[in-house]
């Protein structure tokens, strides 16, 4: 799949994010939009998965550690064929299987229930250790928020991953620079993120999280890295491609009203039109 095809899918993922949060009148659009390109590459290029057989023993595993950003997660799962795209409008509705945090018992393609920040990476480390103990070839991927890494449990898990030399584990940090309280550097700065992971024996790669060429190169490098887990620090834009949401902490956990929804969808339509002209 080429760069343009991936960009078009990522734009569809972003449409699903905006649509689901608007329908629910609740949710977390900012950090979902910032991670849409990472989600797209993982599910359409990187991971060994089969939507027709989501529990295949040899599948790669993904853990959404920043579990509140389900609008992006559900949107890419729907685009990949795990369930109908039309179901996204039931997000957070009473009786829907698509609730605010992912549930592995109810949603096809979800490998781990998550939500409490800091816990997802621990589950991912456990999965990676399990694969090593059973000599299985599957790889484990986990997506963290940059605000999330203020949680101490993240670093306990990172310490163990580095100690166990889990080269089948890839940690991705969505570094959009903002959390619900504002700029992460002002709230409780985790910088330098790369040096912290290096201190725990991680191979670290810094990338532009919206550049598919850099994303592809990073995951290729991670596959070639032996004897160390990999941390990909992806610099991203919170609210990416929605004009009034970009780089605004206020859109961490706010749903657009009808007027804002129309503007957001028009923004994404313009992105689509620009991509179609390439």
Language-model features: where?
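Short acidic, glycine/serine/threonine-rich loops at helix termini
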Residues: 74-75, 103, 153-155, 181-185, ...
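Short secondary-structure boundary/capping segments
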Residues: 80, 187, 246-250
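Glycine-rich beta-alpha junction loops
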Residues: 68-69, 73, 176-177, 211, ...
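Cofactor-binding active-site loop characterized by glycine-rich and histidine/acidic residues
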Residues: 17-21, 32-163
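Thiamine diphosphate
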Residues: 109, 113-116, 121-225
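N-terminal capping segment at the start of a domain
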Residues: 10-26, 174-176
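Glycine/aspartate-rich loop-and-adjacent alpha/beta segment that forms the canonical ThDP
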Residues: 212-278
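N-terminal hydrophobic or amphipathic helices/low-complexity stretches enriched
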Residues: 1-13
């Amino acid at each position: 799949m080429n760069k343009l095809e991936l960009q078009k899918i990522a734009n569809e993922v972003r449409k699903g994010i905006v649509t689901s949060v608007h329908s629910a009148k609740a949710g977390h659009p900012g950090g979902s939009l910032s991670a849409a390109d990472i989600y797209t590459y993982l599910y359409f290029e990187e991971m060994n998965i089969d939507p027709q057989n989501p529990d295949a023993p040899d599948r790669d595993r993904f853990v959404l550690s920043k579990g509140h950003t389900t609008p992006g997660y559900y949107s890419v799962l729907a685009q990949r064929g795990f369930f109908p795209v039309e179901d996204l409008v039931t997000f957070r509705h009473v009786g829907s299987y698509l609730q605010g945090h992912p549930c592995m018992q109810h949603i096809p393609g979800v490998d781990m229930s998550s939500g409490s920040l800091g816990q997802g990476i621990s589950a991912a480390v456990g999965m990676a250790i399990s694969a090593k103990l059973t000599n299985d070839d599957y790889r484990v991927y986990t997506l963290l928020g940059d605000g999330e890494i203020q949680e101490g449990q993240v670093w306990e898990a990172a310490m163990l991953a580095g100690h166990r030399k889990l080269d089948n584990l890839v940690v991705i940090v969505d570094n959009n620079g903002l959390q619900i309280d504002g700029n992460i550097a002002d709230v409780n700065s985790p910088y330098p993120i790369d040096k912290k992971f290096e201190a725990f024996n991680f191979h670290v790669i810094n990338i532009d999280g919206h550049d598919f060429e850099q994303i592809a190169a990073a995951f290729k490098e991670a596959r070639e890295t032996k004897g160390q887990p990999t941390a990909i620090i992806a610099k991203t834009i919170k609210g990416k491609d929605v004009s009034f949401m970009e780089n605004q902490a206020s859109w961490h956990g706010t749903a657009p009203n009808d007027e804002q929804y129309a503007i957001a969808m028009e923004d994404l339509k313009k992105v689509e039109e620009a991509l179609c002209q390439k």
